[in-house]
């Protein structure tokens, strides 16, 4: 099994327990979690909530995931932290600049997975997404360059 901890300015122990989780302080969540995944709205109190000090406090084997809002994490601080080995890895599908430029500090890092954000689920989005997947797989099968791949 897995122990799930949560933090929110509005979370109570009772609400967390009803979902099978334990509510902890933000600092405890950052320092003890194996996987830290952000699910917050972006606002004045959450912008750059994850910065250099939070990344430095994470476990060496932690994985940071942000599929919520780009501004929740300081991307430059995250890139520096990943190069320093804490957290161990990151996975993101939201970025301060989209499409992500090849000069972005996270592009090319071996311990980062960057994917496009599919924030709006509808048939046209999935048709485009699956068409892109088929195009990439076809190129790979025939030894051709992959379309839309970012590399440093």
Range-by-range predicted roles:
Residues 6:
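Conserved SAM-binding motif I beta-strand of class I
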Residues 9-105:
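Rossmann-like adenosine-cofactor binding region
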Residues 96-152:
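C-terminal helix-to-coil terminal segments
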Residues 2-3:
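Residues at the starts of beta-strands that form the adenosine-phosphate
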């Amino acid at each position: 099994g897995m122990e799930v901890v949560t933090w929110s300015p509005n979370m109570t122990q009772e609400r967390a327990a009803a979902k099978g989780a334990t509510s902890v302080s933000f600092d405890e969540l950052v320092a003890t979690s194996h996987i830290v995944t952000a699910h917050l709205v972006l606002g004045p109190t959450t912008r750059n909530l994850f910065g250099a000090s939070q990344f430095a406090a994470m476990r060496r084997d932690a994985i940071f995931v942000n599929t919520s809002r780009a501004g929740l994490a300081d991307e430059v601080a995250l890139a520096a932290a990943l190069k320093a080995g804490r957290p161990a890895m990151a996975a993101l599908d939201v970025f301060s600049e989209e499409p992500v430029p090849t000069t972005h500090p996270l592009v090319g890092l071996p311990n980062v997975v960057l994917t496009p954000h599919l924030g709006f689920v509808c048939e046209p989005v999935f048709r485009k997404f699956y068409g892109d997947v088929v195009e990439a797989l076809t190129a790979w099968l025939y030894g051709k360059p992959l379309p839309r791949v970012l590399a440093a």
